[in-house]
Structure formats: C-alpha cells, structure tokens
Amino acid sequence: MGLRAGGTLGRAGAGRGAPEGPGPSGGAQGGSIHSGRIAAVHNVPLSVLIRPLPSVLDPAKVQSLVDTIREDPDSVPPIDVLWIKGAQGGDYFYSFGGCHRYAAYQQLQRETIPAKLVQSTLSDLRVYLGASTPDLQ
C-alpha cells in the first residue's frame, strides 16, 4: 500500500497493540472505538498526516511519551488515522487524536509514527470538519 503524498507505508508489526475482545468503549481492550478491531499497525510518514485541528499540549505529557518511546516504543499505542480516498483516487490521511504521541514523535525527529489505518469516507470526515470539509481529489 503506497502513499501519494510521499514516503512509504510499512507495517510496524501486525497484531501489536490492544488484545482481542471487546472493551468498555465497544472496541478492543485498550483500542479506540474506531480501530478496536484493526490489528495491523503501519509506520505512517508524519509528512503525509493532515491534522486540521490545533492541539493543546501538556509539555510534561509529551516529555513522558518521548522518554517512553526511547525506552520501550512498543508500549505506546498507535494513533488512529482516517484513510480517505478522494474522488479521483487520491489518498488522504487525517489524524484527529493522539496529539501528545504525534508531538513526541516530532520531538524525537522520527519520520514515521505507528498508526492504525481506519478506512473512512468523505461523510465520515464531514462529521469532524462540518462545512470546512475539503473537496478531496
């Protein structure tokens, strides 16, 4: 699976992350409601992620994640990324959560971040962005 916006998309270890079975949020234990049943984790280039909402960060939390990623990267859950195909086949990768993890990987100057890709539609994106939803090609 390739990315149009540059870089490559590699698997970061299928099955890594949340154990099987439903958790309190309806997804797998430790997973999100979006990606709870998705086992595959990919290394997604930070450069292709679209983050349309500004983050409010706790610097201490970011530093804690930086330390954890350095010591035991597998203990940090992957972020969820909405993967949307545009009208003309373009690939778009939207990330709304995981702002502290995203900032930690940026601070570490990593080129990629572990992510679960959630195949989504323009209608799904409209839930997040409303009238600001772009016309994806």
From Swiss-Prot:
Protein's UniProt keywords contain Signal: no
GO biological process: cellular response to oxidative stress; response to oxidative stress
GO MF, any single term: sulfiredoxin activity
Domain of life: Eukaryota
GO CC terms of this entry: cytoplasm; cytosol; endoplasmic reticulum membrane
Keyword field: Antioxidant, ATP-binding, Cytoplasm, Disulfide bond, Magnesium, Methylation, Nucleotide-binding, Oxidoreductase, Phosphoprotein
Cofactor: Mg(2+)
UniProt main location, coarse: cytoplasm
Catalytic activity: S-hydroxy-S-oxy-L-cysteinyl-[peroxiredoxin] + [protein]-dithiol + ATP = S-hydroxy-L-cysteinyl-[peroxiredoxin] + [protein]-disulfide + ADP + phosphate
Binding positions (ATP): 98-101
Classification via InterPro entries: ParB/Sulfiredoxin_dom, ParB/Sulfiredoxin_sf, Sulfiredoxin
Cytoplasm is among the record's keywords: yes
Biased composition (Gly residues): 1-30
Primary enzyme class: oxidoreductase
Region of interest: Disordered: 1-34
E.C. number(s) listed in UniProt: 1.8.98.2
PANTHER family assigned: PTHR21348, SULFIREDOXIN-1
Entry's family note: Belongs to the sulfiredoxin family.
Role according to the record: Contributes to oxidative stress resistance by reducing cysteine-sulfinic acid formed under exposure to oxidants in the peroxiredoxins PRDX1, PRDX2, PRDX3 and PRDX4. Does not act on PRDX5 or PRDX6. May catalyze the reduction in a multi-step process by acting both as a specific phosphotransferase and a thioltransferase.
Designated name of the protein: Sulfiredoxin-1
Designated gene of the protein: SRXN1
